[in-house]
Amino acid sequence: MEELKSIIRDIPDFPKKGIIFKDITTLLSDAASYQRMIDLLSHRYIGKRIDKVVGVEARGFIIGAALAYKLGAGIVLVRKPGKLPSETFKKTYDLEYGTDTLEMHTDAIKKGERVLIADDLLATGGTMSAVVDMVDSMGGELVECCFMAELEFLNGRTKLPVERVFSLLKF
């Protein structure tokens, strides 16, 4: 894992002063590293009968689509409001200073389908908690929330069903 961690670069003071941003684009643009990351994540779920992989806008699409392909599952997109063309299920959730809303097509997950949620990074857990609620409300059976990386010092997993959280890389 250290070789993958070493490829992710730190960008100081982005998006604002005092934050050290973990830039995953360096890992994604390196074919061997990207393939290794997807192989490591997908290996965890082989044989777990995943029906749908939920990818969270926007970098979760990059990981979710590749995992869905490897697992023979469908991909479901969770997007910001107004980006999906059909009827949507909406979830508004609290941020540190305000609220945000996510949407998913109402027919994207059927009752009883086994769902893997994929995103690039677990930080505070607010977004992922909202997505878990959406999957639950639609009748999906959450297998796990998987992340390429986790910022452990932000304690995001405390907002999630901890036994169903997996992060490949931890910072």
Swiss-Prot record:
Domain of life from the UniProt record: Bacteria
Biological-process GO terms, alphabetical: adenine salvage; AMP salvage; purine ribonucleoside salvage
GO cellular component: cytoplasm
Main location: cytoplasm
Keyword Transferase: yes
The reaction(s) this protein catalyses: AMP + diphosphate = 5-phospho-alpha-D-ribose 1-diphosphate + adenine
Pathway assigned to this chain's UniProt record: Purine metabolism; AMP biosynthesis via salvage pathway; AMP from adenine: step 1/1
Single annotated GO MF: adenine phosphoribosyltransferase activity
Protein name listed in UniProt: Adenine phosphoribosyltransferase
Originating organism: Geotalea daltonii (strain DSM 22248 / JCM 15807 / FRC-32)
Gene symbol of the encoding locus: apt
